[in-house]
Amino acid sequence: MIASIFGKITFVGKRKIIVEANCISYWFNVKENHSFEKNLEKPRQVFCQIIKRMVTNQILEEGFAFNTLEEKEWFSKFIELNGIGSKTALNLLNNNLEEMRDYIKNSNYHALTKLTGSNSKVARALLALELYDRDDGGKRIKPNTAMANDYDEMFDTLKSLGYKPQDIQNALSKIEIKPNFDVSEVIAEVIKLMSFQNNEVTNKTA
């Protein structure tokens, strides 16, 4: 697998760059707040990842470039999670990665929903991300799959009661949920919040 290429950056756009290496030009997708600069004289190392996917019986390749090796590692972890594709993974890189690490480490679901490129579904997926704590000698941070499963249970329960997925996601993102929460209590609070919001909409349109 290619980890990086060494070449000249011949084009820089908002979400794409072109890197020329060994007389071949490569298109790469990049995050929106990237720091790549066009330079036709001096080559540089560009960390990258190639993703292959099947589209109408054809294998298509898509390239992604990163400012640092750390960004590449985060991206690789993101796309391994259920419900997070390459576009969402790239958008997540626009956030402060150290803050995101702390949110995941502390199971701060509410903060995760507020990240750029995130929502309730993405936040639940991030809770299951396996990290290593740099402040504790590289000790493994176990993914909080139990909490992620609890969020899935709440979402499925509310959906079975007839609430719209978008309304559920919006309500969950507005509630500050603490560790060791009671699922039934949170469901009741979400229903209360959605009912209040629906009443507000009804009153405005009346």
UniProtKB/Swiss-Prot annotation:
Q: Where is this region: Flexible linker?
A: 141-145
Family of the protein in this entry: Belongs to the RuvA family.
Q: Where is this region: Domain I?
A: 1-67
Going by the UniProt record, its keywords in alphabetical order are: Cytoplasm, DNA damage, DNA recombination, DNA repair, DNA-binding
Recorded superkingdom: Bacteria
Give TM segment ranges.
none
From which organism does this entry originate? Mycoplasma pneumoniae (strain ATCC 29342 / M129 / Subtype 1) (Mycoplasmoides pneumoniae)
Q: PANTHER family from the xrefs?
A: PROTEIN SMG (PTHR38692:SF1)
Record CDD domains: UBA_RuvA_C
Q: Provide the coiled-coil residue spans.
A: none
Gene3D superfamilies, per the entry: 5' to 3' exonuclease, C-terminal subdomain
Q: How does it assemble?
A: Homotetramer. Forms an RuvA(8)-RuvB(12)-Holliday junction (HJ) complex. HJ DNA is sandwiched between 2 RuvA tetramers; dsDNA enters through RuvA and exits via RuvB. An RuvB hexamer assembles on each DNA strand where it exits the tetramer. Each RuvB hexamer is contacted by two RuvA subunits (via domain III) on 2 adjacent RuvB subunits; this complex drives branch migration. In the full resolvosome a probable DNA-RuvA(4)-RuvB(12)-RuvC(2) complex forms which resolves the HJ.
Listed Pfam families = RuvA_C, RuvA_N
Please name the GO terms of the biological process aspect recorded for this protein, alphabetically.
DNA recombination; DNA repair
GO MF term list? ATP binding; four-way junction DNA binding; four-way junction helicase activity
Q: Protein name, please?
A: Holliday junction branch migration complex subunit RuvA
Q: Which GO terms of the cellular component aspect does the record hold? A: cytoplasm; Holliday junction helicase complex; Holliday junction resolvase complex
